[in-house]
């Protein structure tokens, strides 16, 4: 049933305490609610209280004391009113607030230290359906490579003995009326872990209004965007710097353990302590690092095979008959001009280019393309198994279906409510047809941005053509000979600049569109945002390589009848073919982007951190030498999330798979980059970022489906690359029909200029094409076209069939995990039946135990 949400009044009620908890004579909450008139009603007594609750969250705002003398009244007063209203509503919600100020003559920094009493934690833990432990289990984490090396008796240099390994738990959704069931409930100070406390505080901050909710005046995110507060963050677990080696290892904090055993560069070859990462940063961050480590490990065999294929190409260069014929052809092949103002040239002058092309274009690339297609399929299949194991171990397998709550921004602005068929609760609702309309409108904007990318690509194509003409007219013999390659290389650099600029613009635009679409959950919001940005980035990054791979040199025409684009003659492939140019483009974009990103990730945080510390020290000049924890954490950088990290890796995955036939070294460069990336990201989270709020997740979200789509696209792309952009099939055809040793193959691939062109220039010349003397396609062209199309069909059918077979052969969930899940369901049903029988025998009617894990067998 749909219900319109009341819009006449805007209550600041965060916790409804009007009805006592079933089965528990008194309320466990200790909160208050207030109407707009300011009336307060304090909730009844607590379950218990903690004398000195820890600092759970910090709010910061800066004040320019000099502006008081000449204030810009309107904005300052509005911010002050919003801030005071927000803080008052936090007090009404039951939070403890302590303010600390640091100031000098010019400026002041105000720190609001927030703590949640036991009652508030209990209420929101139940409201948010947080899962809390019922029973401790030994940690059963295992690694297949560690198991294999142990079985073989080989020392494992990858193993790292990390102290304080987090145990596993049976857990279920928290209910305060069943508090005694939960592990550690007798100690209120440690019952809620720091990550759980942060989640609860962030939920309160995200929902608390500071004005009329329907006008969007609610939540800490909006206040940060408006500049009312300059930061909001939970505190780190002390400094990351490690105590001297002589100290006891057990004395290390969680942050110090992560720094010592994970974030240091010297640990690049060690297994990641994922359970420790999950305990400190939450499941979402841990799953990212699990995926990154898994993907990097799988890149190792791909890099080895790719390097072998490339080295094979290096040896084949000097024994390849067509390449040797080209280099020793002297003045045998007089080639037609490459542009309207260019001169005739000798094919032998392109010897170096032909040899470079042979490095990437040989029979080994066919094998490598098949290998990488199956590699990608197996990578995703085994990641599904790894993900299922981690989700079960971290107790988040059903997070999206059952646990996840509506986004605070959605809940505050949704026009009506509806019954959730899974949980049976009334939740905010936005009509799906309205969302679809908004998504269609957003897709129009996406198409416009894609059109901008295509316009940039066309401009790059024209730039290459014009640059080639200009450089070819140079008096320098070297520049003139390499005109095409110079134009291509500089065009790749210009294209990279366009890519980076357009990326920044569209990410901001996609955020606005996704917020407008009103997605119910944070997962749905992130998936929609991710899909928008990825589609744009896919076109942005891959448009130029796709043009070189599949379009360049295809629509050139022939001497005397060349095709043009805006009056400029279409580009031709160089003497070595377009495959070598594609490899160059991939290396410039992929490696260039990786270098730029890594430099940014190293230098930008350092520079920002230095600036932040410099500003902070100026504002607290004369204060104590040892800053308070909240002051030290405020000097760190705000956490920017995982979106850009995932995007970088997924785009890299596309370069590694979609165009791998042109660049077998791509997996090697990706592997080297990722070894750096893992520790770089780890250092950012441990040392340079403020602590993020721990978020739960059950998988890597829509990124997995994007990776699966790229895998399918890679099969088709490599099939067409090998068929139409490589000389592999023409060489095979020639060796079968004419000469097995490929002698004469070079002459076979060159057509003669038509008589009209020859008579106009008083000179005959050759050009790369399968055409007759009149410029028409020869029978050989049509025969090769049929062979190419047949190869594409056979290649993709073989790969897709093999991939489907492997998909069926490898279960998505490991058998051990499947047995554990079934066992838990059985125990849960058994516990429910026993509980009902017990209640029926005693005649007691009460609330049933929370259903989740095998520990539901605990008595009621």
Curated annotation (Swiss-Prot):
Q: Which residues lie on this side of the membrane: Extracellular?
A: 319-362, 463-492, 552-652, 723-779
Q: Where is this region: Disordered?
A: 24-50
Where are glycans found on this sequence? 747, 762
Predominantly, its location class is membrane
Q: Where in the cell is it found?
A: Cell membrane; Endoplasmic reticulum
Q: Does the keyword Cell membrane apply?
A: yes
Q: Which domain of life is it from?
A: Eukaryota
Per the record, what are the reactions this protein catalyses? a 1,2-diacyl-sn-glycero-3-phospho-L-serine(in) = a 1,2-diacyl-sn-glycero-3-phospho-L-serine(out); a beta-D-galactosyl-(1<->1')-N-acylsphing-4-enine(out) = a beta-D-galactosyl-(1<->1')-N-acylsphing-4-enine(in); a 1,2-diacyl-sn-glycero-3-phosphocholine(in) = a 1,2-diacyl-sn-glycero-3-phosphocholine(out)
Single GO MF annotation: chloride channel activity
Can you cite a GO biological process for this protein? calcium activated phosphatidylserine scrambling
UniProt keyword list:
Cell membrane, Endoplasmic reticulum, Glycoprotein, Lipid transport, Membrane, Transmembrane, Transmembrane helix, Transport
Q: InterPro entries per the record?
A: Anoct_dimer (IPR032394), Anoctamin (IPR007632), Anoctamin_TM (IPR049452)
Q: How does it sit in the membrane?
A: Multi-pass membrane protein
For this protein, the record's PANTHER family field holds: ANOCTAMIN (PTHR12308), ANOCTAMIN-7 (PTHR12308:SF22)
Q: What else is known?
A: The term 'anoctamin' was coined because these channels are anion selective and have eight (OCT) transmembrane segments. There is some dissatisfaction in the field with the Ano nomenclature because it is not certain that all the members of this family are anion channels or have the 8-transmembrane topology.
Indicate the family of this protein: Belongs to the anoctamin family.
What is this protein's function per UniProt? Has calcium-dependent phospholipid scramblase activity; scrambles phosphatidylserine, phosphatidylcholine and galactosylceramide. Does not exhibit calcium-activated chloride channel (CaCC) activity. May play a role in cell-cell interactions.
What is the protein name for this chain?
Anoctamin-7
Q: What is the lineage of its organism?
A: Eukaryota, Metazoa, Chordata, Craniata, Vertebrata
